[in-house]
Amino acid sequence: MKFEIMNENHRDKVLELSKAFYCSDALDHEVPMNIIETNIDAAISGDKGLIGFVFCEDNEVVGFSYVTTYYETEVGGICVQIIDLYVNENARGKGVATQYFNYLFDKYSDAKRFRFEVVKDNVKAISLYKKMGFTDVSYGQMKIDKI
């Protein structure tokens, strides 16, 4: 498995995978197509603080993820926020997510925390994440959208 920084050549495949991801049970709400396209644009341009990664197997993109980093005062250092993680159905069960997390741990070896969101119903993903050492965050989050 090879992990690459998302670029313009990946756009069409990431859009295809994004449509599958954003319609899956990994989310608890719909995401409009214009937002999906904006996310891809931001990741490819690299100027919005969003980094896109694609997962390639035999020169085929089989998954994608977005990452952003920020300073987390609770740990006194950088937090890597994994935003979206999708592997197509044909590539699941082959350790892609585990390999990706290990790739991120190496790439961001100076980070003090790695964090992401997962819906409570995604039992298989939660089981994997716990096996890797991730723990639940005991407090909720709040938001206000200004889209």
Give short role names for the model-derived ranges:
Residues 22-41:
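Conserved GNAT-fold acetyl-CoA-binding loop/helix
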Residues 92, 115-126, 143-147:
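Conserved beta-strand-loop-alpha-helix junction that forms the acyl-donor binding cleft
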